[in-house]
A protein has these predicted regions:
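Glycine-rich flexible loops
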Residues: 1-212
Length: 212
């Protein structure tokens, strides 16, 4: 298992059938990589992940751990999350790759907002610095990829305008931003709007990115 994955996991099947939205996921992922909002840092650590939810089953498909450096994903580079348990710090999945280290974070968003259908986690230090404590922001003491992060995000849904803002900053992980929407188009649009508001012409800088 990847050293960055902090949950225990259980695989039920090594393969799953192609899902609607896989081509779209790859397309938006390609744009994020071109903007250097996901990829691999100078230490060789991948950062950034995406997911889409199956509205019928509430399962969700997420990019696999340690796949951020792959230019174009195949189905084998994704995982289908079937179940999770925050208290046990556990994820049940299908697929040949381990789900992203942020799988519990994605699960918390889908559980908290019935309208959420897609999530983007990326790293953009410039936008992060602007929205930190201005948009919904997780506690600086909470680490990424943990049950505490899942619970913290669920708290933000209860006490902030996260439902309407659809974006949050991770105070304890410099550069970490999460956006969501009814689909990837909306999640990406939220992210691009914040980048434009932060600095229309600036290139992002990156620090201490969250492993995929």
């Amino acid at each position: 298992m990847s050293e960055y994955v902090k949950f225990t996991c259980e695989r039920t099947n090594a393969e799953f059938t192609a899902f609607d939205g896989f081509a779209e996921l790859n397309a938006y992922r390609r744009q994020l990589r071109e903007l250097r909002l996901m990829g691999v840092d100078s230490n060789g650590v991948g950062f950034g992940n995406l997911s889409v939810q199956d509205g019928a089953t509430k399962n969700f498909y997420i990019t696999g751990s340690a796949t951020a450096g792959i230019p174009e994903l195949t189905l084998a580079d994704c995982a289908k999350v079937l179940a999770y348990d925050f208290e046990r710090n556990w994820v049940g999945y299908e697929g040949s790759t381990i789900p992203s280290s942020e799988s519990l974070t994605h699960a918390a968003i889908y559980e908290s907002d019935a309208k959420a259908g897609a999530i983007i986690h990326c790293h953009d230090s410039r936008s992060w610095a602007v929205i930190l404590n201005q948009a919904p922001t997780t506690s600086k003491t909470v680490k990424y990829g943990t049950p505490k992060m899942a619970y913290e995000i669920m708290r933000l849904f209860r006490v902030t305008d996260l439902h309407s803002r659809k974006i949050l900053a991770m105070a304890g992980h410099e550069g970490g931003i999460v956006t969501f929407g009814r689909d990837l188009e909306e999640a990406f649009a939220v992210l691009m709007h914040e980048r434009k508001e932060s600095s229309p012409c600036a290139n992002s800088a990156f620090h201490k990115r969250t492993p995929a």
